[in-house]
Curated annotation (Swiss-Prot):
This protein binds specifically to 23S rRNA; its binding is stimulated by other ribosomal proteins, e.g. L4, L17, and L20. It is important during the early stages of 50S assembly. It makes multiple contacts with different domains of the 23S rRNA in the assembled 50S subunit and ribosome. The globular domain of the protein is located near the polypeptide exit tunnel on the outside of the subunit, while an extended beta-hairpin is found that lines the wall of the exit tunnel in the center of the 70S ribosome. Keywords: Ribonucleoprotein, Ribosomal protein, RNA-binding, rRNA-binding. It comes from Streptococcus pyogenes serotype M1. This is Large ribosomal subunit protein uL22. Part of the 50S ribosomal subunit. GO terms for cellular component: cytosolic large ribosomal subunit. One of its GO terms (molecular function) is rRNA binding. The gene is rplV.
Length: 114
């Protein structure tokens, strides 16, 4: 049987838009996990906090569940899929209302041994 060399973590229904989340994910894709954590610590973005927690969870999964070494791990895959959208209305002039879409994201981070 083949040896497992990757681990995954997901954060579902995060209250950040997928478009903004993808901008941060592009910064860490393909980097070593230590470099990725350093990048996320200095990224002033709400999505960066969530991605950092998800990345740490993926690292913990790799170490505890599959016995992988943290020093050898690389962020191999990252993606942000659209979650459920909360629909709200903003009151406007003359008794009308405009729709507001509060978007959510499903963040997935996969780390693997290089």
């Amino acid at each position: 049987m083949a040896e497992i060399t990757s681990a995954k973590a997901m954060a579902r229904t995060v209250r950040v838009s997928p478009r903004k989340t993808r901008l941060v994910l592009d910064l860490i894709r393909g980097k070593k996990v230590a470099d990725a954590i350093a990048i996320l610590k200095f990224t002033p973005n709400k999505a960066a906090r969530v991605i950092e927690k998800t990345l740490n969870s993926a690292i913990a999964n790799a170490e505890n569940n599959f016995g992988l070494e943290k020093a050898n791990l690389v962020v191999s895959e990252t993606f942000a899929n659209e979650g459920p959208t909360m629909k709200r209305f903003r009151p406007r002039a003359k008794g009308s209302a405009s729709p507001i879409n509060k978007r959510t994201t499903h963040v997935t981070v996969v780390v693997s041994e290089k």
